[in-house]
Amino acid sequence: MVKLADGSEKGLKGHFKEDFSHRTRIGLAPRAGHVDRDAPFKRIATEEAWTFPALVKAQVDYFESGAAKADDSLKMGAMFSKMPSLQEMLQDLGELRIAHMDELGIDRQLLLLTAPGVQVVKPGDGTALAREANDIAADACARHPDRFSALAAFDPRDVAGSVTELERAAKLGLNGAVLNSHWQGHYIDEQDYWPILEALEANDLALYIHPTAPFNGAHYETRGFFGALGGFPHDVWLHTMGIIFSGAFDRFPKLRLVIGHMGECMPLQLYRFDWMQGNADNRAGLRGGQPPVKLQHPVSYYFHNNIWITTSGVAWEPAIKFCMDVLGPERVLYAMDYPYQQSYDEVAAYDRMDIAPDLKKMLMEDNARRVFNLPA
């Protein structure tokens, strides 16, 4: 337990009161271990969530208005709003968060505005909330420059406002941008939103696509799979493949895309993606009636040149080694997924992994610095 300035103890063990936080060690979960406090690298965690009260209220108000009944991401946001200790951790960008980082051995967090983000509030309100979020994040980074970096929020429904806000975020010194996947069933591969991709490339900002619950996903909800067990990876998979097959990377070849949770399983399918692309090029109908597509490169090329993945929530040595092998060790970044998934034993598991020291330093520190232009 860590003592805060007011004398209270707010260690991770026992901090959560909500039932969803009580987990049993089963299956592949890492065994108990000890974190190396003298590791020859900094631990930079690159998918670490936060939020702020005005956004939580705006999400709940929009949910309760009934204006977007088919959007399970709003249901998810409303559910999280009723978890006080989760909200305490999400909304703290100071003493409590840093105490938890110290307890876990994390040197720096990359802050991402948590799902469902600013794109699921009342239309017209998202850009102002994004601006407020980015000011809060920039202030936290200024107050704790050795501990926090942050990605910018934007509301893709307001394309012109998003472009302006991304330009402002770059001037604020933010280190990229985060999009919590779809907004009422729309995705950034649709060409109406390409000015946002152009702005990201022009301002040298990597885009992190973070999961949210799928749109109109009753079949996920009834089975209890709209989150990490199904809906999250499926939605980011759809979003990422849409960006690739739209030709966006051919149009914006310097665009950088980051996806979490070990690439949402996509690295395992690179062979099949290339094989199916070879059958779909210039042939209408093979992709569910879509028009013919001719990309400049195989799908795997974009994973090797435009896409990076993080290990958020997957502290599993075989998967990490596989992804480092098929994508390249420079394309895999460490992440924890605080506060949703946090584990001292997972951090210790990274220390134990049988990975060459230079490659482990790339995983834990160097790759994050390069992709997100973090300070040395």
Model-derived features: where do they sit?
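Mid-to-C-terminal alpha-helical segments outside catalytic/metal-binding sites
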Residues: V2-I44, T51-R108, D135-R143, T164-R168, ...
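Generic detector of well-ordered alpha-helical packing
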Residues: E48-A49, P211, M262, Y338
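Short glycine-enriched loops at secondary-structure junctions
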Residues: P156, P211-F215, Y338-Y340
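Short coil-to-beta-strand
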Residues: E103-L111, I209, F215-N216
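A short acidic, helix-capping loop that chelates divalent metal ions and anchors anionic groups
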Residues: G117-K122
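Catalytic pocket-lining loop regions of alpha/beta-barrel enzymes
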Residues: R168-L327, R331
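Charged helix-capping and loop-helix junction motifs
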Residues: G126-N134, D189-P195
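Short loop/turn segments at strand-loop or loop-helix junctions that form parts
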Residues: L112-P116
